[in-house]
Swiss-Prot record:
Family membership noted in the UniProt record: Belongs to the universal ribosomal protein uL16 family.
GO biological process, one term: translation
Name of the coding gene: rplP
Keyword terms, alphabetized: Ribonucleoprotein, Ribosomal protein, RNA-binding, rRNA-binding, tRNA-binding
Record's protein name: Large ribosomal subunit protein uL16
Subunit text: Part of the 50S ribosomal subunit.
Organism phylogeny: Bacteria, Bacillati, Bacillota, Clostridia, Halanaerobiales
Function: Binds 23S rRNA and is also seen to make contacts with the A and possibly P site tRNAs.
Amino acid sequence: MLIPKRVKYRKQHRGRMTGKAKRGNRITFGEYGLQALEPAWITNRQIEAARVAITRSLKRGGKVWIKIFPDKPVTAKPAETRMGGGKGAPEKWVAVVKPGRIMFEVAGVSEELAREAIRLASHKLPIKTRFVKREEMDGEANES
């Protein structure tokens, strides 16, 4: 499970998820990627489930990169607790994902195998995603 080793502050504000991803929206390591089309908080458990789905589908072939890290603590108060008494204890860790963000990358396998692995991973995530190729991403960069 991915969690930060140490953080400066134990609790954080929720923040806003407006706009598109300005960073991490290009394929940098692999040949194929899984791109987010909606904004969401992705928990460390969801990231791990998607990673396991990809690695099992690839059957020890190819390489997988996880491009998001859950560095935001989400707090929760116990059930049936009265209001007040301060902010709850950190419950889970999430990665803030905006539209356009590349979440996973795959290399060293055929396109069909990569497409299937990424399809299985996308079912583990709570957002709409799409399969992207490095060639397509390079084409978009040249146009703009």
